[in-house]
Swiss-Prot record:
Keywords: Glycosyltransferase, Lipid A biosynthesis, Lipid biosynthesis, Lipid metabolism, Transferase. It comes from the Bacteria. This is Lipid-A-disaccharide synthase. The lineage of its organism: Bacteria, Pseudomonadati, Pseudomonadota, Alphaproteobacteria, Hyphomicrobiales. One of its GO terms (biological process) is lipid A biosynthetic process. InterPro entries: Glyco_trans_19. It holds the Pfam family LpxB. Belongs to the LpxB family. Condensation of UDP-2,3-diacylglucosamine and 2,3-diacylglucosamine-1-phosphate to form lipid A disaccharide, a precursor of lipid A, a phosphorylated glycolipid that anchors the lipopolysaccharide to the outer membrane of the cell. Pathway: Bacterial outer membrane biogenesis; LPS lipid A biosynthesis. It catalyses: a lipid X + a UDP-2-N,3-O-bis[(3R)-3-hydroxyacyl]-alpha-D-glucosamine = a lipid A disaccharide + UDP + H(+). Its EC number is 2.4.1.182.
């Protein structure tokens, strides 16, 4: 008697932001290489996951909500999508649920799934920043997450200390992209030319750009008034171009606006220094070897909350990974033209600040190494192992 073929392994993935969509797509690609036609994907994702064959439950743009007031206004819709997504997981009964970033949404789904079907293994790809604030989340996650895939090398130890679920460092996706971040010989000459390229990165969301662009422009104006010569480039994405152009209209010095990811990377490869809003971009700049000054401004309510919640000495991701505060940060009321301009002058010249950053950035390859395996491969290995093991 012939035995029937093994049923397909079903994996349910949830990614509600573009960065998570890219991670999900890379993970799906490796899982398909491992399982061939024996895998079926369901879930929520964006355009890149769709290219790997995912039919999303709803467009992720429905959750592109920024700002406290907007979130409150859209709360009934958000809660409905959480319920509907959890119901879809429970109906599918997958061999694994992989939640990717966006913890305010994905963790609520995971908790509902675990409460109603504890047999479904749950993997969390991208740790919440519990090492920075609300550390108690680690123990809470123990109740509904079986394994965390960390992007940062210090995260497994943080989970161990905080009593959270098992966490493995799989590597940041940026380490798979070093070739596009680092200059060739000709680009290195441009990076070291007499007229240095200064990058300005005011944020990747409209609200972030509006919080930073005016003060950044004023700081650059001061720098120019002091006689400092530089070429200014401002990388952004197509959907943010109008916001950027509106913001720089009153700038005393006009930047060249660079549109798109490939063009941004080309600008990174020739840049001498940067002024950036704190975020993932600081790690991108550091891996590219670009000394920087960082700033961070938010609304008054958010600032009030963050001041009482933050438990790390620096909010700069690159500083946290390096383990040393080499990059200056100007937060909230310290984010002023008067303070930013002198710091920018230092990173544009051969100063101690600039040299310290360059030396620290040279250590990142070793600090962030994942051996000879790509992050997406390591992530897929753990998802498959968790599926085989089932619920602990």
């Amino acid at each position: 008697m012939m035995q029937g073929r093994d049923p397909k392994r079903k994996i349910f993935l949830i990614a509600t932001e573009e960065s998570g969509d890219r991670l999900g797509s890379a993970l799906m690609k490796v899982l398909r290489q491992r399982l061939g036609d024996g895998v079926q994907f369901e879930g929520v994702g964006g355009r890149t996951m769709a290219r790997e064959g995912l039919e999303t439950l709803f467009p992720i743009e429905e959750l592109s909500i920024v700002g406290f007031a907007a979130v409150v206004q859209q709360l009934p819709k958000i809660l409905r999508l959480i319920r509907e997504t959890a119901d879809a997981v429970l109906e599918a009964v997958p061999d694994a649920l992989v939640i990717i970033d966006s913890p305010d949404f994905t963790h609520r789904v995971a908790r509902r799934v675990r409460a109603r079907n504890p047999a479904i293994p749950i993997v969390d790809y991208v740790s919440p920043q519990l090492w920075a604030w609300r550390p108690g989340r680690a123990r809470t996650m123990l109740g509904y997450v079986d394994h965390v895939l960390g992007l940062l090398p210090f995260e497994p130890e943080e989970y161990r200390k905080l009593g959270g679920p098992p966490c493995s460092y799989v590597g940041h996706p940026l380490i798979e992209q070093l070739g596009s971040l680092r200059p060739n010989a000709e680009e290195q000459k441009r990076r070291n030319s007499e007229l240095p390229v200064l990058l300005v990165l005011p944020g990747s969301r409209r609200s972030e750009i509006r919080h930073h662009i005016e003060v950044f422009g004023a700081a650059l104006g001061r720098l120019q008034a002091e006689g400092r010569a530089f070429e200014l480039m401002l990388p952004t994405m197509p959907h943010l171009e109008a916001t950027v152009r509106e913001g720089i209209a009153s700038w005393p010095v006009k930047p060249q606006i660079v549109i798109g990811e490939a063009e941004k990377r080309a600008a990174f490869r020739i840049a001498h220094a940067a002024l950036a809003k704190s975020g993932t971009v600081t790690l991108e700049l550091a891996l590219s070897g670009i000394p920087m000054v960082t700033a961070y401004r938010v609304g008054a309510i958010e600032a009030f909350i963050l001041r009482r919640a933050i438990r790390v000495s620096s909010v700069i991701l690159a500083n946290l990974v390096i383990g040393e505060d080499v990059i200056p940060e100007f937060l909230q009321e310290d984010c002023t033209p008067e303070k930013l301009a002198p710091a920018l002058s230092e990173v544009l010249t051969d100063s101690d600040m600039r040299r310290r950053q360059v030396e620290a950035f040279a250590r990142l390859d070793t600090i962030m190494s994942t051996g000879n395996k790509a992050p997406s491969v390591l992530a897929a290995d753990i998802v498959l192992a968790t599926m085989r093991k089932g619920r602990r």
